[in-house]
Amino acid sequence: MKLFLLFTLTLVNIFSVSLQEPIQNQPAGNNTITSPHRNVWRALSEAEFSGVSAVLVHQLNLTTSRGGNRIIQIDYLYPNKSDVLLFLDHNGEEPKRYARATVQFGSPEVPYLQEYRIGPLPATNTTAVEPLRFPFNGKVQGKTKITSLDADGIDAFLPQLSSVVEDITRKLWNTTLAEGGVSFNLGKASFNSDSTQTIWLGFLNNATTGFDSSTLLPLGVSMQLDITSRDYNDWFVLYWFYNNKLYTPTSFNETVYSSDFQPPLANIDGPWTSTNKQEPTFLLDDLPPPKAISRGKNRYNLDTEENYVQWMDFSFYFSSHTDRGLSLFNVVYKSKRIIYELSLQEALAHYAGVEPVPSEAVYFDTQTGMGRSMISLIKGYDCPDYATYLNSSFSSRTGVTITPDAICLFESDSQFPLRRHTSQAFGYASAARNVVFTVRWIATVGNYDYLFDYDFFYDGAIEVKVRASGYIQGAYYAGNEEYGFKIHDALSGSMHDHVMTFKADLDIYGEKNSVQKVEVVPETTIYPWSQGQPHNTMKLNRGFVTSETDSSIDWAADDAISYTIVNKDSPNKYGEYPGYRFRRVAPAIHLTVKNSTSGGKALHYATHDLFITQQKDNEPCAADRNNAYNIDDPLVDFEKFLDGESLEQEDLVLWINMGMHHTPHTEDLPNTIMTSAYSGIRFEPFNYLESGDPSVKSAQQARIILSNS
């Protein structure tokens, strides 16, 4: 004990000396470099967009009217991997650039969207405009029927609707839709088996405190509209829903005006929805907290023209896309590509509840656009002050929009060592700083804010993390006990699943790879030395996932099974297959609902924790932004990707789900907190580095000689 105490005191004294190193907050600067080649995934320029828009209008005779034949969206169509690899690896030509356009044809009785490919760019009046089919596998590739409301919108109908339901809204809330005293949340516009089209609306109280809190203010009353006709003057109210009962318009009017009717308790806006500072302040919280600083020039290189980054042994390109947000391409580690593409595919939120709108609610956030929803970051809060801030861009119907400071890049200390060891016998202690390089972006989609991180580590690992905040979409509390907790006067937290699907196209020593599966299992065995006595222990069961038939995978309950993308044709010098293992580092879920009534075939990619398929140029994405319009025959039905093909030494793609089962509670008010609503996946070298842990080459480590006297 005496020796231990003396040793400990000596160690503390030595470390205390090292901590006296002066720290200077010097302004950071970017190290500018030139990328090895053009960024073939770069977003459309304004000039490219203008050319595409002009040729579409010219060749398809388009207008700008809301319900007519018009452009809905134009954005960049990423090149095929096969073409890019010819360019990157075989000195081929740079792939030609093409645009994708979604065009609404609103003139037919049943309007529809048609996808087009335009190019090569730059476009002129003679540039080819042809239906885009190859990325889609629906029955009618590249064509999606839409409801009358989706084509025409609801704004023109609002004055008429307000007048029709005024007797109800006056009686219940002493206001009208036209007056703005109440509003509503739109449900899902649906095609029905009898050829009608309907939609539910859930009434909301208005936010009055200057905060975006309307989703916390449900009023417990819903109505269903028939929207079959292309003329909104023919739309009408089909049903009302209140207090777990369905009413016809006539019966609901009679009920509301009956002498014994009890109006629903309203959710009323107030300080409880505000994120302004409230009293009393935390103890000593008025003092300045610790703050991360940069002590010198940035330790990464950047080509801002091509969106190319180098950090330590890593390099990669990034690109922002209207639908999917920020993606990474051609991730190289130690001069070898390890990931061709790392990208968000869909951000799905599936709700449940007793009322029609939450019961039917499935939000496909690429429909809104994760890139369109990228926001300007708040320096010092969303990212460190010393981070590098970059703009992003997205294209829509009318042009290219620049979002300033939408991406941040920075290094940070993880506040725990990457590795360490103290040896009393040999008289030393060693430790290495765990420095992480982060590429961060945030998308605010309606009421929710999603923070995404791509993290790079000294040990060759990459992590993808997502955190959620913002205002929950609440439900009315009456009758909703099986779907949420009562969290305010008349408010229930509406249970929902968040599922964020990522594509990870790994290339380990080339494109031809396999999936190694290793399971830790209990074992009872007799060893030659155990003299016939059984020994209870454990062992490794090694194998491979050889077919797409077996590649719909859920994480083992105790994480006893690990999966690694390996190259069986390039064993290391010890005879093991080099690879990158992938695993969850935070809660990572799949969709709870089986055979979702509201999601149909549009969300098969969310039904397991991960999938592994052969890479194909005609299967570039797990989902499409327009899948929600026709869930029975979506543009991309992911289930069709799983057609039993071999996974033995093929070009493989992982489709990995992150997210959380969210049951809101009182602490979700006013906003959900990111410390609990988060998920993460890690890709890490596994028998990939023959020389061992690469961090031994880092200058950010110390070896301290200990004195025992």
Swiss-Prot record:
Which residues are recorded as binding Ca(2+) 1?
A: 505-507, 651-652
Cofactor comment: Binds 1 copper ion per subunit. Binds 2 calcium ions per subunit.
Q: How is it modified after translation?
A: Topaquinone (TPQ) is generated by copper-dependent autoxidation of a specific tyrosyl residue.
GO BP annotations of the record are:
amine metabolic process
Disulfide bridge map? 383-408
**Signal sequence annotation:** 1-20
- GO CC annotations, alphabetized: plasma membrane
E.C. numbers: 1.4.3.-
Active site (UniProt): 365 (proton acceptor), 448 (schiff-base intermediate with substrate)
**Amino acids binding Ca(2+) 2:** 548, 641, 645
Q: Name one GO molecular function term.
A: primary methylamine oxidase activity
Q: What happens when the gene is disrupted?
A: Leads to the accumu-lation of new glycine-containing victorin derivatives.
Listed binding positions for Cu cation are 496, 498, 662
Q: How does it assemble?
A: Homodimer; disulfide-linked.
Homology family: Belongs to the copper/topaquinone oxidase family.
Task: Please give the name of this protein.
Answer: Copper amine oxidase vicK1
Native organism taxonomy: Eukaryota, Fungi, Dikarya, Ascomycota, Pezizomycotina
